[in-house]
UniProtKB/Swiss-Prot annotation:
Pathway of action: Amino-acid degradation; L-tryptophan degradation via kynurenine pathway; L-kynurenine from L-tryptophan: step 1/2
Annotated protein name in UniProt: Tryptophan 2,3-dioxygenase
Domain of life: Bacteria
The protein's required cofactors: heme
Annotated HAMAP family: T23O
Cofactor notes: Binds 1 heme group per subunit.
Function statement: Heme-dependent dioxygenase that catalyzes the oxidative cleavage of the L-tryptophan (L-Trp) pyrrole ring and converts L-tryptophan to N-formyl-L-kynurenine. Catalyzes the oxidative cleavage of the indole moiety.
Catalytic activity: L-tryptophan + O2 = N-formyl-L-kynurenine
Any GO molecular function: tryptophan 2,3-dioxygenase activity
UniProt cross-references to SUPFAM superfamilies, sorted A to Z: Indolic compounds 2,3-dioxygenase-like (SSF140959)
Keyword Cell inner membrane: no
Lineage, broadest ranks: Bacteria, Bacillati, Bacillota, Bacilli, Bacillales
Binding-site list for substrate: F48, I49, V50, I51, H52, Y110, R114, T251
């Protein structure tokens, strides 16, 4: 071996793994990296699969953080929740960037393998559905999509019936002494949240006296961050779909771009947006 080809190996580097776990074993890379099964011979289908699988991994982490944050807020541990929610926002920014990679797929390339997808669609992503549930956008009718898998259906049913991030945030307002209407506190949490004047009045007071309600103010801003990022993700999703398939119907049966444009108007924390006008 020539002098300039020598590999410098530090003395402490481990090389014997006969009885020790390797990096690949820890991450179960054999399983992870063998999960990209193309259904066509088209080169670009690999891009399509990897982008969506990577997004699902990020969504798994988002759910991990959201659920932990919800539990922390329930227990009045707001500071740890702030860290978790900040991490969610960082993950969201990462997922948004992935649309730039998928956008390198042209209409001519996608049409070569689109039929291989059958009726499979991102609309069926159960993790995305659970994220919506965790944020308070409850859609009971969507459970029908998951009836094929009883175990998965049960998990989504449980998520539908669990308090959302906004539910526990409103409870935090109550614990601070704000008078929230009983209809809000006793509402059916399996239904989409509807804005309420008493909740808006409470958040308005929080924003009007930040020093007094610093933790609630920080919580509110973390929620706004998450919804802001989610709306940006939805917009990039819509524009990427429009760029690749135009206004064709989605593989899952939706109206495609028209549907994605409509969901841009959905809000998770309406009062937090309203107070910005009223301050």
């Amino acid at each position: 071996m020539k002098e300039n080809e020598k590999v410098i190996m530090e003395k402490g580097i481990h090389t014997d793994f006969k009885e020790n776990m390797t990096y690949g074993e820890y991450l179960q890379l054999d399983s992870l990296l063998s999960s990209q099964k193309r259904l066509s011979d088209h080169h670009d289908e690999m891009l399509f699969i990897v982008i969506h699988q990577a997004s699902e991994l990020w969504m798994k982490l988002i759910l991990h953080e959201l659920n932990a944050a919800i539990e922390s807020i329930k227990q009045d541990k707001l500071q740890p929740a702030f860290k978790m929610l900040a991490r969610v926002s960082k993950i969201q920014s990462q997922i948004i960037q992935s649309w730039d990679i998928l956008a390198t797929l042209t209409p001519s390339e996608y049409i070569e393998f689109r039929d291989s997808l059958g009726q499979a669609s991102g609309f069926q992503s159960y993790q995305y559905r659970m994220i919506e549930y965790a944020l308070g956008y409850k859609t009971p009718h969507a459970l029908k999509i998951y009836e094929k898998d009883p175990e998965l259906h049960a998990r989504l049913h449980a998520a539908l019936h669990a308090p959302s991030l906004y539910d526990v945030a409103i409870q935090a307002l109550v614990k601070e002494g704000f008078p929230i209407h009983k209809d809000v506190l006793n509402r059916d949490i399996t239904q989409p949240y509807e804005e309420d004047a008493t909740v808006e009045a409470a958040w308005l007071e929080v924003y009007a006296d930040v020093k007094k309600y610093w933790n609630l103010y920080q919580l509110a801003e973390k929620l706004i961050d998450i919804e802001d990022w989610l709306q940006q993700w939805r917009f990039r999703h819509m524009k990427t779909v429009e760029r690749i398939i135009g206004h064709k119907m989605g593989t899952g049966g939706s109206s495609g771009v028209s549907y994605l444009k409509r969901v841009l108007d959905q809000r998770f924390f309406p009062e937090l947006w309203n107070v910005r006008t009223k301050l």
